[in-house]
Structures are given as C-alpha cells and as structure tokens.
C-alpha cells in the first residue's frame, strides 16, 4: 500500500548512516563486519513502518536484523522506530526484494520474513508476488542450506498461492497456522497491518517453509 510522501524523508535517511545503509552493494559478504559480530542475520522483505523488525530486534538481542523496503517514506517511519528504540542490532535498506543477491553473499542471511506482502491478485501480476518462483530463487541463494521463510498474511488467496508455490519449489512446510491468533505463537511480534486486521476480526495465516 502506498503512503503519502513525507517531507524530509530523504534527509532523515541520509542523516542516520548508523542505521540506514546507503551503499548496500559494497556490504555484500561483509555484513558480520558491519554489525561488528558473527550473530545470525535475519531480514524482513517489505518491512513497512518497522514495527515487526524493531520488535524482533528488541526481543532477540543476539540476532541481527535488516529491514528492507523500496518506499522511502515508509522506510523513514521505520527509522523513527529504530531511533526511538536505539538498538544496535538493526539496519535498514531501501532496495527492491528482487535484487537481494546484489547485497548479500550466498548463505549470508540466516532467516527471511515476509509479512503482509502485496497480494497482487490479478493473474497478470503473479510475477510480482514475493512468493513467486523467481523470488524464491533469490531467497534460496542468500539463505543457508535448509534456510527458512516465515510468512504471514491476512489474504487467504495469497496464502494458498504461497503454500502451493513453496511446495512446488520443493520446500517443506514445517508448520502452518490457519488462525494464528486463535492457535497462538509464543513470542509473536505483530506488524501494523496484523494488529489492524486482527482487531477487525480477520484471520491471520502463517507458515514456516524450509528450503531443501
């Protein structure tokens, strides 16, 4: 979902290089050095306003997190959260999810999150869905052997499509939630959309899929 442009967003991102990486191509293969440790690295593709990735970073200080979003304004709101939290284990990137191999070396990322991605419901837009085969090819390259994707959505159609896409790719569906909030998940960190939709009584779907 597009948001109204935010005045000063570009300057805000540029003025906080400790969190916002402006030259991600130069970081490929060097993320442990950038974080200053060898802790696992988890990324969220389509991090929106940053509630999930910031919450995860606060909850798991021994894991490094990278929030990725192509929209400058949205990323600037994520930066607001990061600055308020003051956490050392989080970075932000303004890049496209289809180009991740330009910024991460093979197996450099330990886990990947997709939360409430655009469902692109029209058939002609299938290739834009973040669980389409070409995206899975990209994710597999930067994740380790048996690396995992954790996926959440309120959209039943996208969820069913994604389950089929993961399965057709040869991934193992380790765990599937057809009603996340009814079934419960210890340590679940909600996104902005997740709270909004669940408050309206909408079901939240989740799956943990593992490459083979």
Curated annotation (Swiss-Prot):
It is an enzyme of class 2 (transferase). PROSITE patterns: SAM_MT_TRMB. The keyword tRNA processing applies. The active site is at 118. S-adenosyl-L-methionine binds at residues 44, 69, 96, 118. GO terms for molecular function: tRNA (guanine(46)-N7)-methyltransferase activity. It comes from the Bacteria. It catalyses: guanosine(46) in tRNA + S-adenosyl-L-methionine = N(7)-methylguanosine(46) in tRNA + S-adenosyl-L-homocysteine. Its EC number is 2.1.1.33. GO terms for cellular component: tRNA methyltransferase complex. Keywords: Methyltransferase, S-adenosyl-L-methionine, Transferase, tRNA processing. Substrate binds at residues 122, 154, 191-194. InterPro entries: SAM-dependent_MTases_sf, tRNA_(Gua-N-7)_MeTrfase_Trmb, tRNA_methyltr_TrmB_bact. Pathway: tRNA modification; N(7)-methylguanine-tRNA biosynthesis. Residues 124-129 are annotated as: Interaction with RNA. NCBIfam families: PRK00121.2-2, tRNA (guanosine(46)-N7)-methyltransferase TrmB. Catalyzes the formation of N(7)-methylguanine at position 46 (m7G46) in tRNA. PANTHER family: 3-DEOXY-D-MANNO-OCTULOSONIC-ACID TRANSFERASE/TRNA GUANINE-N 7 - -METHYLTRANSFERASE, PENTACOTRIPEPTIDE-REPEAT REGION OF PRORP DOMAIN-CONTAINING PROTEIN. Belongs to the class I-like SAM-binding methyltransferase superfamily. TrmB family. This is tRNA (guanine-N(7)-)-methyltransferase. It comes from Streptococcus suis (strain 05ZYH33).
């Amino acid at each position: 979902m597009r948001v109204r442009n935010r005045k000063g967003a570009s300057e805000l991102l540029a003025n906080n290089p400790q969190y916002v990486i402006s030259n991600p191509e130069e970081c490929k293969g060097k993320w442990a050095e950038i974080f200053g440790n060898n802790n696992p690295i988890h990324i969220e593709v389509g991090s929106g306003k940053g509630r999930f990735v910031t919450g995860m970073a606060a909850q798991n200080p021994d894991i490094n997190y990278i929030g990725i979003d192509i929209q400058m304004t949205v990323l600037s709101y994520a930066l607001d959260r990061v600055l308020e939290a003051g956490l050392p284990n989080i970075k932000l990137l303004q890049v496209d999810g289809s180009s991740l191999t330009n910024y991460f070396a093979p197996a450099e990322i330990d886990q990947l999150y997709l939360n409430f991605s655009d469902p692109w419901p029209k058939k002609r837009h299938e290739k834009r869905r973040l669980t389409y085969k070409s995206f899975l090819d990209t994710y597999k390259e930067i994740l380790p052997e048996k690396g995992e994707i954790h996926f959440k959505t309120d959209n039943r159609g996208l969820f069913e499509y994604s389950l089929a896409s993961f399965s057709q790719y040869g991934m193992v569906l380790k765990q599937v939630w057809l009603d996340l909030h009814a079934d419960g998940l210890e340590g679940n960190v909600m996104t902005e959309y997740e709270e909004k939709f669940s408050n309206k009584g909408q079901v939240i779907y989740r799956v943990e899929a593992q490459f083979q």
